[in-house]
Amino acid sequence: MKKLLLTLLAALLLFSGCAAQKQESQPQQTAAEQTAELEPSAAPQWEELRFDTSLPLSYATQFSVRYAEGGYTDITIGSDQEFLLVAQDAAVPENVPSSITILRQPLSHIYLVASAAMDYFDRLDAVDRIALSGLKASDWYIESAKAAMEDGSMVYAGKYSAPDYETILEAGCDLAIENTMIYHTPEVIEQLQTVGVPVLVERSSYESDPLGRIEWLKLYAALVGKEAQATADFESCLASLSGILDHPSTGKTVSFFYINNSGAVNVRKSGDYIAKAIRLAGGEYLSFDESGEENALSTMTIQMESFYSAAADADVLIYNSTIDGELQSIDELLAKSPLLADFKAVKSGNVWCITKNFYQQSLALGDMLLDVHAVLTDEKTPDAELRFLRRLS
């Protein structure tokens, strides 16, 4: 692989050094390059573009989308990413700042490493835009993604820290969508960009409001030109949640946790989106911090004694099986810590396990809210009426 990269980089340097020389055999030009040569006046100046229309957002704060006439979309993510999405029949503007990454529609050979984003593409009927996956077929819980890999229309191209550059280049990748784990291996970003693959680092995990995470559907819709569908879907989601968002708190306390291999307990901080989702659903989240920190890493690990002291009288326990594996019974939970037998929720049969496929289904957060509200308002809610929660007995 290193040999391939060195060869490719050497070729790029050789090309740049010889750009002034005319050669008998020239590489085939893209349609955009041919248009630019035939109609140089068709390309507007960057300074002339007026992004005077925006995609309405109600809860999301980590991205924005603006539009200019002529087929130009400006997308910003966080404070350090900006993209110019150019329509297929539009010319790339002149003098675009180097800090802005240019994307050309249609984006149809995406390398998706941020697995949580697949659910957005699935909802938009746009899984066919993804040619390369950062997960193997056996690791997908989203059926459309699994099916695409099984029929060969989507192929495995390596995980975030070890992409298969040869496969990526052969596929003609036009965008890599990464999660923030990529910042641990910045050399991968540099290498992808060097070989001509734009990189977008998605930040939905930095949305502190659960509804903001759901609204990221609109960001992916902008990439594939389906904003109207995304807006309608988001409004439908809000409508389905209106009954619980306006519902007063039940006053019931909820603890969301898992037990690691050393016997310590991992819990969400009070500012985490899961904690906020529980509050939106009508519960009182049991927190173990006072910071109200709101970021993607808002979890903490505490000793079982501390967890026992604060959560023994919790009305509801929800075990996070997306990290530790899905539990099948109370006995399996008690095997992790016999102390849990003293907990009020264990004695009353109000212990639930979140299913392991939840973490891949970003849009399912709305259903999760409905599930939590159901178990808070009716302790006899049957599993069949829930999507992601299953009672442990």
Residue ranges with predicted function:
Residues 1-9:
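Positively charged n-region of N-terminal signal peptides that target proteins for export
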Residues 13-17:
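C-terminal motif of bacterial Sec signal peptides marking the signal peptidase cleavage site
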Residues 19-118, 229-256, 380-393:
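Bacterial Sec-exported substrate-binding components of ABC uptake systems
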Residues 104, 158-163, 179-186, 207-214, ...:
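Soluble non-cytosolic domains of exported or imported proteins
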Residues 108, 115-121, 133-144, 184-187, ...:
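Extracytoplasmic ligand-binding site segments that recognize negatively charged/polar headgroups
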Residues 207-235, 316-393:
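Structured C-terminal subdomain patch of bacterial secreted/periplasmic proteins
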Residues 244-328:
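Flexible, glycine-rich surface segments
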